[in-house]
Amino acid sequence: MPPRITALTDPEPAASSRRSAWLASDSEGVPIGSAFLRLFAKEGQEHLAELQVAVHRAERRQGVGTRLLEAAVAAARSEGRRSILAQTNEGSPGDLFLAARGFRRVLTLTYARLPLADADLTRIDTIAEQVHDGYRMTHWDGTVPSALAQTYAASRRAMDDMPMEGTDYGTVVWDVERVVSAAEVIAKRGDLLHTVAVLDTADGSVVGFSELVVPGSGRGDGQHYGTAVLPEHRGHGLGLWMKAHSIRLARRRHPDLAGLLTDTADSNSLMRGINDTLGYLPTHKAVEYQLDL
């Protein structure tokens, strides 16, 4: 008997996106799979949707995932989306599933972790304490200070040319409102946002940044978000400098933190080199698939 597919709606849509969901259940009403479709709403990404499909291992290869996928794709089409992205671990059942259903592999990511108990803190301190003529370091917790908000929002364009290979991710348009909103979302869920930034001493503007999100408990693993430098300020080692500062601050502020997590496109050789220099150890690879509608 084919699974029953029940459509669900997101009770709390965000300003930047909203989600649709589908639950697959067997003849007795027992859940056996799910699909979530995130529909981006911000300028520059209105064409895009992001998909997650999961099926109980005992129910795989029986058409459950296909039924869920069909429902999600139909919804994306009805919303006028042109691309659906889906990420899965390399070599996993999801990898095989997406490849067999018309998705094409567009990006490979390496996930890595820095175990803080084993980190070479002397090396990290040496990098963090280097002097970079024409630049100075600053940092803040949570929402960006008002005096830096405008140039910090402007510096987010440093992410625009991040290596994404063939991914149709669009261009994220950042302004002060969006920067503040993103920080508020992190705070609302109980996590702590720490941002390190490099300022141009000539005018005090933000030219690079590195974000780290730590669990509110200060335990477990922190997650690096964006690290980027404006194109006109690259080539001075600012990315390595900022990430070393971020590690050092995390260690000092959260002594019970176990590690730091990061993920980097395999084609982003510069950032992978920074991670290697700082002692991050690869844990696994993920692949980004795209379905063109």
Where are these regions (language model features)?
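Conserved beta-hairpin
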Residues: 7-10, 18-35, 193-208
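Conserved acetyl-CoA-binding loop-helix of GNAT-fold acetyltransferases
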Residues: 55, 61-74, 99-100, 229, ...
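Conserved N-terminal entry element of GNAT/NAT acetyltransferase domains
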Residues: 1-10, 118-146, 150, 161
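Conserved GNAT-fold acetyl-CoA-binding loop/helix
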Residues: 1-14, 160-181
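Conserved catalytic-core motifs of GNAT/GCN5-like acyltransferases
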Residues: 39-42, 85-89, 104-118, 276-293
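Conserved beta-strand-loop-alpha-helix junction that forms the acyl-donor binding cleft
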Residues: 60, 85-94, 230-234, 260-272, ...
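Conserved GNAT acetyl-CoA-binding A-motif
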Residues: 76-89, 250-263
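A conserved beta-turn-beta hairpin within the catalytic core of GNAT-like acetyltransferases
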Residues: 34, 40-52, 59-60, 215-225, ...
